[in-house]
Amino acid sequence: MLRYLTAGESHGPQLTAIIEGLPAGLKISDESINCDLARRQCGYGRGGRMKIERDEAQILSGVRWGETIGSPVTLCIVNRDWINWQEKMSPNARHRDEKIRVTRSRPGHADLPGAMKYDHRDVRNILERSSARETAVRVAVGAVAKAFLASFGIEVNGFVSEVGGIRAERRSLQLERMKELSAASELFTYDAEAEERMKAFIDGAREAGDTVGGVVEIIASGLPVGLGSHVQWDRKLDARLAMAVMSIQAIKGVEIGLGFDAARRPGSQVHDEIYYDSTRISRGELSGFYRKSNNAGGIEGGITNGEDIVIRAAMKPIPTLYRPLRSVDMQTKEPFEATVERSDVCAVPAAAVVAEAVVALELANAMLEKFGGDSLGEVRRNYEGYLEYVRAF
């Protein structure tokens, strides 16, 4: 079983993650992790903090000479802005300063419900941890999971498919071409014409003091049939993936395959017919069974069916607006216009990178549940033995 915990506040000294359950012998490096961290900080519409932070992960435990050794892996990302917050975010009681308490909660954030739940009179105790800054360390953990999946020929790729109601058209693009186009895009999208309209929409929102949401699409390819299970509700892979993606800050909806559109179609236009071709095995495919459509998004009954997993997630517009929304001061109960923290206009491209990470983590966990071992070699032997069985089925 693969599990992880993250810790740290947005303006604290660092973000930390501990990963448990990685097999020994997996090659990882801080360079590969930092590549994904850099992608998270890119994207059209990002805010001022991206000019301060240049995220770099440090591997503190569980890795020796570039390979995991079987013990927990610890990662940390230093917050470079900490130098400006040392007293405001100090763990020491001697630095307490009631004059800097934040009592004005912002609509759309965890501020007010969090303060009421934890009996805080200072909203900063909530907003620091609820901030999307936390996703930086989840991207780092996800990069490790992606390295594990890559050793089995499995890829997880994220794209922006919609911004502000402007949709990218995939048409007949194959996955490799989508990857090439999105890598060259400031919005991580594969439709150049739609990208220009998206950027113009973001520019308009910036001028109006507003923010923009959108939709990200995650495609996982190279997966075998049989990950997840139908036997219990909490073992269904689609349920676990949906929870992982919904855990990302500002995500308000998740769909797999056709998703909500399946409710609008007759069954004859929804379910993927099954075919068999024995020559697929000689061509390097994992199974002779296949489907000509993928409306299920690669999962049936909570189990992977051998097709690509396709997930889409809706991200709401960032709630911190430069044209402030109305709220109420927790202490005085007086109305006010919400305070402005540094913020993005559009963080949908970053959400695509974060969604990649959490999906990779859940898939790596499913792989280890199915083919687990103490070393990567043992996991690979179990995996290859299973593939022999599947090819002969």
Swiss-Prot record:
UniProt-annotated binding residues for NADP(+): 40, 46
GO cellular component: cytosol
SUPFAM superfamilies per the UniProt record, alphabetical: Chorismate synthase, AroC
Keyword hit for Lyase: yes
GO molecular function, one term: chorismate synthase activity
Catalysis: reaction(s): 5-O-(1-carboxyvinyl)-3-phosphoshikimate = chorismate + phosphate
Cofactor note: Reduced FMN (FMNH(2)).
Binding site for FMN: 129-131, 249-250, 301, 316-320, 342
Keyword Lyase: yes
Entry's Gene Ontology BP terms: amino acid biosynthetic process; aromatic amino acid family biosynthetic process; chorismate biosynthetic process
Necessary cofactors: FMNH2
Metabolic or biological pathway: Metabolic intermediate biosynthesis; chorismate biosynthesis; chorismate from D-erythrose 4-phosphate and phosphoenolpyruvate: step 7/7
EC id: 4.2.3.5
Origin: domain of life: Bacteria
Signal peptide: none
Pfam families in alphabetical order: Chorismate_synt
Keyword line: Amino-acid biosynthesis, Aromatic amino acid biosynthesis, FAD, Flavoprotein, FMN, Lyase, NADP
Oligomeric and partner information: Homotetramer.
Role this protein plays: This reaction introduces a second double bond into the aromatic ring system.
Membership in a protein family: Belongs to the chorismate synthase family.
HAMAP family: Chorismate_synth
Protein known as: Chorismate synthase
Organism encoding this protein: Geobacter sulfurreducens (strain ATCC 51573 / DSM 12127 / PCA)
